[in-house]
Curated annotation (Swiss-Prot):
Pfam family, any one: AA_permease_2
The protein, known as: Probable fructoselysine/psicoselysine transporter FrlA
Keywords: Amino-acid transport, Cell inner membrane, Cell membrane, Membrane, Transmembrane, Transmembrane helix, Transport
Topology versus the membrane: Multi-pass membrane protein
GO molecular function list: L-amino acid transmembrane transporter activity
Gene: frlA
Compartments where found: Cell inner membrane
Family the entry assigns: Belongs to the amino acid-polyamine-organocation (APC) superfamily.
Superkingdom of origin: Bacteria
Protein's organism: Escherichia coli O157:H7
Involved pathway(s): Carbohydrate metabolism; fructoselysine degradation
Catalytic function, reaction form: N(6)-(D-fructosyl)-L-lysine(in) = N(6)-(D-fructosyl)-L-lysine(out); N(6)-(D-psicosyl)-L-lysine(in) = N(6)-(D-psicosyl)-L-lysine(out)
Length: 445
């Protein structure tokens, strides 16, 4: 067993690239249409993206403080543990491993193949093997080198931003101001009310998730006291600007009623640009593959750090805490999570069912934001960076997180509650087993 610790090798730009690369995913290809449908008017659509990004800043401030107080790998697991609840911390990690981390790898890999199928026909079984090959390729990349993986992540993040920049640049030339004078597509949107805006903001929520992924790797980040706040808040602002400009341009390119009813808003909007025309679908498919490749790479890189942290605390399978003696990476954790992701590729029905665990994952995030209140009561709590206007920012972080909890509950209330029961029913016995084992190991040491 490798007993060495992971080293701090990641600088600011690599960390920023991971945060932005994880956040800018496939969701943006449909979310503009969903936000337009919810908000009901072009201006409310754009404003929803602005406010949707701004309300994420308090969340990033909370993560920044917690990550500088506990500059180690593990993110939510570490913060909940230090807030005084090891069982809750374990349950958060337990749910993440089985219902979120590995399934997300399979979902993204299959999404890449799906977009590839737009360019050339692919046999379904062959497509699954291609998806598995993508996971294996990224496993090898991130297993062999943290620096190499970070360099790739930086390049792929730049590559995924370029197509959106092209869309924004071209869209400005064919922007039609009259599209912003279009009548509202919903009764609530016609009133320009706060409820219409709130509906739009809620629809943007998923587009802004992912920045906190870097907290899983805080133990490998150089100078976390400065790097984490800059990367977390900086990534939020960068994504906010990108999404707002994209929403503005798309709303100005095509009639708003068509945008609000579009399931492929970016692709449909690009058909209104003469320079692209019929090639819009191909452009979007290639862009989507690049975007999702970056997100898949990022997840293969950061997600195994959670199980690594739990294993180091003797609260998970011991092998997950192994560090490769040459490459200084959590090799076993990367391999086993990737292997489980490949398994889910070939059991697609199970993967779709695991989507119902989203309610549990959203509630876990809310608990994490609340954990800072308990952490601040500890005598040994000494963060290197503190949340400004703590009394305002923390409630905002919790409230904005609850928006996702509420919308997810409305989407699938009964399945979501059943999944919560499953997490508790399986997680607590597992915690009892590992907690007992941990006490025994501590007694022997």
């Amino acid at each position: 067993m490798g007993s060495q610790e992971l080293q701090r090798k990641l600088g600011f730009w690599a960390v920023l690239a991971i945060a932005v690369g994880t956040t800018v995913g496939s969701g943006i290809f449909v979310s503009v249409g969903e936000v337009a449908k919810a908000a009901g008017t072009p201006w409310l659509t754009v404003l929803a993206f602005v406010i949707g990004g701004l309300i994420v800043i308090p969340q990033m401030c909370v993560y920044a403080e917690l990550s500088t107080a506990y500059p180690e790998n593990g993110a939510d697991y570490v913060y909940l543990k230090n807030a005084g609840s090891r069982p809750l911390a374990f349950l958060s990690g337990w749910a993440s491993f089985w219902a979120n981390d590995a399934p997300s790898l399979s979902i993204m890999a299959l999404a890449i193949v799906s977009n590839l199928g737009f360019l050339t026909p692919i046999d379904p079984l062959l497509g699954k093997f291609i998806a598995a090959g993508l996971i294996i390729a990224f496993m090898l990349l991130h297993l062999r080198s943290v620096e190499g993986g970070a360099a790739f992540q930086t390049l792929i993040t730049i590559a995924k931003i370029i197509p959106f920049t092209i869309v924004i640049g071209l869209g400005i030339f064919w922007f039609k101001a009259e599209n912003f004078a279009a009548p509202a597509t919903t009764a609530i949107g016609a009133t320009g009310s706060f409820m219409a805006l709130l509906a739009g903001i809620s629809a943007t929520s998923w587009s802004y998730t992912g920045m906190a992924s870097i907290c899983y790797m805080t133990g490998e980040i150089k100078n976390p006291g400065k790097t984490m706040p800059r990367a977390l808040i900086g990534s939020c602002l960068l994504v906010l600007v990108l999404y707002t400009l994209l929403a503005l341009v798309i709303s100005g390119l095509m009639p708003f009623d068509k945008l609000a009813n579009s399931e492929t808003p970016i692709s449909d909007a690009l058909t209104w640009i003469p320079a692209l025309g019929s090639t819009a679908g191909i452009f979007v498919a290639i862009t989507a593959m690049i975007v999702i490749l970056g997100s898949l790479s990022s997840c293969v890189m950061y997600q195994p750090r959670l199980e690594y942290a739990m294993a180091k605390d003797n609260l998970f399978f011991k092998c997950f805490g192994h560090v490769h003696p040459k490459y200084n990476t959590p090799d076993v954790s990367i391999i086993l999570q990737g292997a489980l992701g490949i398994f889910f590729i070939f059991v697609s029905d199970l993967t779709s069912l695991l989507g119902y665990f989203t309610l549990v994952m959203c509630f876990k995030n809310t608990l994490t934001f609340g954990s800072i209140i308990w952490c601040r009561k500890r005598d040994d709590y000494k963060p290197l960076w503190r949340t400004p206007a703590f009394g305002l920012m923390t409630p905002l972080a919790i409230a904005s997180s609850l928006i996702l909890v509420a919308s997810t509950f409305v989407w699938a209330p009964i399945p979501g509650l059943i999944c919560a029961v499953i997490v508790i029913a399986t997680g607590l016995p597992a915690y009892a087993f590992w907690a007992k084992r941990s006490r025994q190991l501590n007694a022997l040491s």
